Every structure is written in C-alpha cells, then in structure tokens.
Amino acid sequence: MSERKIRVLVAKPGLDGHDRGAKVIARALRDAGMEVIYTGLRQTPEMIASAALQEDVDAVGISILSGAHKTLCPRIVELLRENGMEDTLVLVGGIVPQEDIPQLKEAGVAEVFLPGTSTEDIVSFLRENVRQSLS
C-alpha cells in the first residue's frame, strides 16, 4: 500500500488581487506529486477554514501581500483549531516583515516563506512536516 498524497489548500485571503505567486506555488506542489486545491482570490478566513475542512487537507498555504497577515493568519489558525484541525500545517508566503514572523509562529503558523524562497524549499518543508498516514 502506498502513502497517500499530501493535500494542500492554497488560499488568498483578504482584498489582495495579486495571485501569480499563489498559482506558481500551487503548480510546483502539483508537479511534486501533491494534491492542491486553490481557493481563488478574496477569501475570508471562514471560507478558507471551511474549504480546508471539506477538502480534508494536510496543510493550508496562505499567500498574502496585503499587509493584513497579523489579523488574517491567526484567525485562520483559530478557525482550523475550532474545527478539530490542530494537526493541519499552516504556512504563510508573501510579503511579511521579519519582525512579524515570531508573532505569526506564536499564533500557530508553522512557517513563513518570504519572497525569493525556492519552490523546492517549500516542497521539502511540506514533505518533512506533514504527518502522512497510509490510505
């Protein structure tokens, strides 16, 4: 029996209308053999958490450039926990000031990937940190 594929939800919360980076990451994860669900633009934390629950994902990747990471990301983590998804990794990618990273990690974000991070690094992080179970 083979291990099931890692399932990742890639989400764009808030009013940010730039999704090129999220689409690049989604394609890279697919190319690496992961199942990827892309939510599209302008998602609320509630929409993201609901999609994560419905899709039974292992990780949620939040692409954010709007500067609202300090409110949106902790809210997404909170909603996932409320839905019993404590083991779901939450990753953030985008423009996040270095000084905000500790606050995000304290709120439950597993990792923050800044501009210039290679897609290989993101794939490796997911493979190393998602607890895979056999189908």
Each model region followed by its residue ranges:
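N-terminal pre-triad scaffold of radical SAM enzymes
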Residues: 11-15
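Short, flexible coil/linker segments at domain boundaries that flank nucleotide/cofactor-interacting
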Residues: 1-5, 85
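Cofactor-cradling patches in redox/metallo enzymes
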Residues: 22-127, 132
